[in-house]
């Protein structure tokens, strides 16, 4: 049995007539929280360096030395060698530790930490007289920081943040890149370390590296690092940091590399996942047009975050939503509703649900751009998660649309798939569907076509489904279904009400004029 608070929350979601568009959008943001959470499988938070070729990191002399097979060192030997004070021994043992940590399967991160090697590895980061040792230590620490939060914490507690930030400006590009990689892992752990990096002034040296001379692979790492600095929202990144990073992200949005575009779009999605003020700073960069272009990309890794970003933007004000409409979002959404990936269908429907929460002129633009038919198709045969978002789109549309707009949706066949979904187990979605049906009946009442709609609902098997909900476990569902039946389907009483004369201005009228009735026939 739901608690009073749950019931109140459901009632708020059910009763949305009379709410303004901002309230409708805000409610949708809360309901689709699972859409808004950063999904760990969509963009990688942390990465281990397991595959750099040795010839990139060793001097020719060291390569010659490594060509002779030597048995791997034990952890005890590594600890002794790293603490020996002998440069050659330090390097050999640090490299052995790095190799252990770079194993693809079960790297012994905790063993290295418990052996007390992190302070020594951090110390080696400042050995500017030995760039190979610096690099090996940086690589080892990068891989430890790619682990759990506790493992990342051990790297931070060892003093690695200032040491790595100073290495961003290293004259050796491979060391600088490894430092960025390590810092990206630290930032990816969460808002605490993200803000620690920002407070240590990591952004200026990082942005200085975004230039045409930076190799592509390195630029990818920098972009990923920047996206991690934009990530997380408890708390959000400081606005001062956002304003520093945004111009460079805007520049990177025009790159032609798919990995850079993907990470930049993810960064934009994090920055727009917040208050209207945060959405506004992104919209004001003028980047919305480019985001819409990227929604046409054949690459899923680009479509997903660009769609997410635009979806976030249309949770904002009517003006912010209009910026997305003016940039052409309504032209690309029909094809995304039919995308082969259900996750894209779901996000597209979510975006539409927020546009549908807008004023009637924005709803009219949805109609003009041909969104109703693919939306009904999705409601009919889409993946269930996508169908749930489509249900929200229909309910918001019928809440804020004009009578004529509601009729157009009904004429597109929305009733049958909507009624069919009343048999699902998700109480929240059933309430939203009943809300949409109630909204459609209100439109029919205004046209004097309530009786026709009753017959249509009955022919589609809807009455039977609504009646069945009177035995539903959820009392909110039961009450909503009962209210519909009592108001519109109570047998002879309903017929009597339908035949009662209606008081017009000058006389009694039984129904609206025929012309109007034909124009808006259900």
From Swiss-Prot:
Its main location: cytoplasm. The gene is kpna1. InterPro entries: ARM-like, ARM-type_fold, Arm_3, Armadillo, Importin-a_IBB, Importin-a_IBB_sf, Importin_alpha. It comes from Xenopus laevis. Forms a complex with importin subunit beta-1. The keyword Repeat applies. GO terms for biological process: NLS-bearing protein import into nucleus. SMART domains: ARM (SM00185). Residues 2-57 form the IBB domain. One of its GO terms (molecular function) is nuclear localization sequence binding. GO terms for cellular component: cytoplasm; nucleus. The importin beta binding domain (IBB domain), which is sufficient for binding importin beta and essential for nuclear protein import confers import only, but not re-export out of the nucleus. This is Importin subunit alpha-5. Essential for selective protein import into nucleus. Promotes signal-dependent binding of karyophilic proteins to the nuclear envelope. Residues 308-396 are annotated as: NLS binding site (minor). Residues 7-22 have a biased composition (Basic and acidic residues). The keyword Kinase does not apply.
């Amino acid at each position: 049995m739901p608690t009073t608070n749950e019931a109140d929350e459901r009632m708020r979601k059910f009763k949305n007539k009379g709410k303004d568009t901002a309230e409708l959008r805000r409610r949708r943001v809360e309901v689709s929280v699972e859409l808004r959470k950063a999904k760990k499988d969509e963009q990688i938070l942390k990465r281990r360096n397991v595959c750099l070729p040795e010839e990139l990191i060793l001097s020719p002399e060291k390569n010659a030395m490594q060509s002779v097979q030597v048995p791997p060192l034990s952890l005890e030997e590594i600890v002794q060698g790293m603490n020996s004070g002998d440069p050659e021994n330090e390097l050999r043992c640090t490299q052995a530790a790095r190799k252990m940590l770079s194993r693809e399967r079960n790297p012994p991160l905790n063993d290295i930490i418990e052996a007390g090697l992190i302070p020594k590895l951090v110390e080696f980061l400042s050995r500017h007289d030995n760039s190979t040792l610096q690099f090996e230590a940086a690589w080892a620490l990068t891989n430890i920081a790619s682990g759990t939060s506790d493992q990342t914490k051990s790297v931070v507690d060892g003093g690695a943040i200032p040491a790595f930030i100073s290495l961003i400006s290293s004259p050796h590009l491979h060391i600088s890149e490894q430092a960025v990689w390590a810092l990206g892992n630290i930032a990816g752990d969460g808002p605490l370390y993200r803000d620690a990096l920002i407070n240590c002034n990591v952004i200026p040296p990082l942005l200085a590296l975004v230039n045409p001379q930076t190799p592509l692979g390195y630029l990818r790492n920098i972009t990923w690092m920047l996206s991690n600095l934009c990530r997380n929202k408890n708390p959000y990144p400081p606005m001062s940091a956002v304003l520093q990073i945004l111009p460079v992200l805007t520049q990177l949005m025009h790159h032609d590399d798919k990995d850079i575009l993907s990470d930049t779009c993810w960064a934009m999605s994090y920055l727009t996942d917040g208050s209207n003020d945060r959405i506004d700073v992104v919209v004001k960069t003028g980047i919305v047009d480019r985001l819409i272009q990227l929604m046409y990309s054949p690459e899923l890794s680009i479509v997903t975050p660009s769609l997410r970003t635009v979806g976030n933007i249309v949770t904002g004000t009517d003006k912010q939503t209009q910026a997305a409409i003016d940039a052409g979002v309504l032209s690309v959404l029909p094809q995304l509703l039919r995308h082969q990936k259900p996750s894209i269908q779901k996000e597209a429907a979510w975006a539409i649900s927020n546009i549908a929460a807008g004023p009637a002129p924005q709803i009219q633009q949805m109609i003009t751009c041909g969104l109703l038919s693919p939306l009904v198709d999705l409601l009919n045969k889409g993946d269930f998660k996508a169908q749930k978002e489509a249900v929200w789109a229909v309910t918001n549309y019928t809440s804020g649309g004009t009578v004529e707009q509601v009729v157009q949706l009904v004429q597109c066949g929305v009733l049958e798939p909507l009624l069919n979904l009343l048999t699902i187990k998700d109480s929240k979605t059933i309430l939203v569907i009943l809300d949409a049906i109630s909204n459609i009946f209100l439109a029919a009442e205004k046209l004097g076509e309530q009786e026709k709609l009753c017959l249509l609902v009955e022919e589609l098997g809807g009455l039977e489904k609504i009646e069945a909900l009177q035995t539903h476990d959820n009392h909110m569902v039961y009450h909503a279904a009962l209210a519909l039946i009592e108001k519109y389907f109570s047998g002879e009483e309903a017929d009597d009400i339908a035949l009662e004369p209606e008081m017009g201005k000058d006389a009694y009228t039984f129904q609206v004029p025929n012309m109007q009735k034909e124009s808006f026939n259900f």
